[in-house]
From Swiss-Prot:
Domain of life from the UniProt record: Eukaryota
Pfam families found in the cross-reference section: Dcc1
Miscellaneous information on this protein: Present with 1660 molecules/cell in log phase SD medium.
Annotated GO CC locations: chromatin; chromosome, centromeric region; Ctf18 RFC-like complex
Protein name per the record: Sister chromatid cohesion protein DCC1
Subunit structure: Component of the CTF18-RFC complex, which consists of CTF18, CTF8, DCC1, RFC2, RFC3, RFC4 and RFC5.
Role this protein plays: Component of the RFC-like complex CTF18-RFC which is required for efficient establishment of chromosome cohesion during S-phase and may load or unload POL30/PCNA. During a clamp loading circle, the RFC:clamp complex binds to DNA and the recognition of the double-stranded/single-stranded junction stimulates ATP hydrolysis by RFC. The complex presumably provides bipartite ATP sites in which one subunit supplies a catalytic site for hydrolysis of ATP bound to the neighboring subunit. Dissociation of RFC from the clamp leaves the clamp encircling DNA.
Keywords assigned: DNA replication
Protein species of origin: Saccharomyces cerevisiae (strain ATCC 204508 / S288c)
The family this protein is said to belong to: Belongs to the DCC1 family.
Gene Ontology biological process: DNA replication; maintenance of DNA trinucleotide repeats; maintenance of mitotic sister chromatid cohesion; mitotic sister chromatid cohesion; telomere tethering at nuclear periphery
Length: 380
């Protein structure tokens, strides 16, 4: 099989070549999905360009190469082409003519990544009465009114964006998209649990209307910050929406809620000081609404604490730790000379950017050994 190749190329920067993975090719060939593919970036100059489907995001990386890549198309010559068949060296006659019309020195590689929300214009809501007035005074900041508008301007797929929005406690207040502060989110969760239990609502089948009504019955003040949208935000973060239910209902994630209360207890009682674990467990339990049905264990708070001694606990904020792996291990071993493998993993996993096996990653900076049924990690 052979073709006649004609060439009249010029370098044309308007053409961009993108490597298509098998998954991307399948999406392009699927009429149901291909219209959902979008190119996005945060701005025109500095941000990386990403390609988004309905549920995934790929970052584009430009790769220059020394070879010349020709862009070609089929064409019909004005005059028939004649040639000496002996020059074919036994190949069949050319069956078509193509012409190289442009050339490029680079192509874009697609790598799957985690999409991100653009939260630059999204304010924090702390339950204050004058929230709308504060927003109106921020004349230089664009106000975003809907989640669809936020997703349109964020380098992420729709499904990833919605999931992240629920995870961070995204909501709407007075027609403005906002994020609930950690303090207000904790208050809203506590009020929701207290009200739902007082009204004997089924914690495994909550709906927004009944829950909002139950919360409203307990608010005597004229100003009630716990709007329907706020209640839905709390349910989206701390519960799972039942897909098969006839009505929209949510099932509370009891272990996750217990962990959330535990993190608040760490910050409140053992931030900067240590406390016996048994005493801390009592204080943790005291934060829950009376008779809230959950079990607690210090292991639920891995990644948020260290143990100065075998029987004491103290809060640690991962955001304050160095991002350099070597320095982070040094800091962790200053806080605690010997770590159980399961306790240290949540504190160092984010640094394993190459996706190595966690044991291999740890061995680069520390020692690990078996002590009975446990694996412990110590400094070199």
């Amino acid at each position: 099989m052979s073709i006649n190749l004609h060439s009249a190329p010029e370098y044309d920067p308007s053409y961009k070549l993108i490597q298509l993975t098998p998954e991307l090719l399948d999406i392009i060939q699927d009429p149901v999905q291909n219209h959902q593919l979008r190119f996005k970036s945060l701005d025109k100059d500095k941000s990386e360009v990403v390609l988004c489907s309905h549920d995934k995001t790929w970052v584009l990386k430009q790769r220059k190469h020394s070879n010349t890549v020709l862009l070609m198309r089929e064409f019909v010559p004005e005059q028939p082409i004649t040639f000496d068949e002996t020059l074919l060296f036994g190949l069949s006659k050319p069956y078509m003519d193509v012409v190289g019309f442009a050339k490029t020195e680079s192509e874009f590689e697609t790598r799957e990544t985690h999409g991100e929300l653009n939260l630059n214009s999204v304010p924090i809501y702390n339950g204050e009465l004058d929230f709308s007035d504060k927003i109106m005074k921020r004349s230089s900041t664009k106000v975003i009114g809907t989640l669809e508008e936020l997703l349109e301007n964020s380098p992420c797929s729709a499904l990833e964006g919605i999931s992240k929005w629920h995870k961070i406690g995204g909501s709407v207040k007075d027609g403005v998209l906002c994020i609930l502060s950690q303090d207000f989110l904790f208050k809203a969760l506590h009020v929701l649990l207290m009200s739902a239990m007082a009204e004997s609502l089924d914690l495994q089948h909550l709906n927004v209307e009944d829950t909002h009504h139950a919360v409203g019955k307990d608010i005597e003040d004229e100003f009630n910050p716990y709007t329907r949208e706020i209640i839905e935000t709390v349910l989206n973060k701390f519960a799972v929406q039942e897909q098969e239910a006839e009505n929209n209902t949510w099932r509370l994630r009891i272990p996750f809620i217990a962990q959330w209360y535990g993190i608040q207890a760490l910050r409140k009682y053992v931030s900067g000081i240590s406390m016996p674990i048994d005493e801390f467990l009592i204080k943790w339990k005291s934060l829950f609404p009376p008779f809230f049905p959950c079990d607690i264990d210090i292991d639920m708070l891995r990644g948020y604490h260290f143990k100065p001694t075998d029987k004491t606990v103290q809060y640690i904020a991962k955001s304050t730790l160095p991002m350099d792996p070597k320095e982070r291990f040094k800091v962790l071993f200053r806080l605690q000379s010997q770590w159980d493998l399961e306790d240290i993993k949540p504190l160092i996993e984010e640094l394993n950017s190459r996706g190595m096996k966690i044991d291999s990653f740890i061995m680069k900076y520390a020692r690990r050994k078996r002590l009975g049924k446990k694996t412990v990690v110590t400094s070199r």
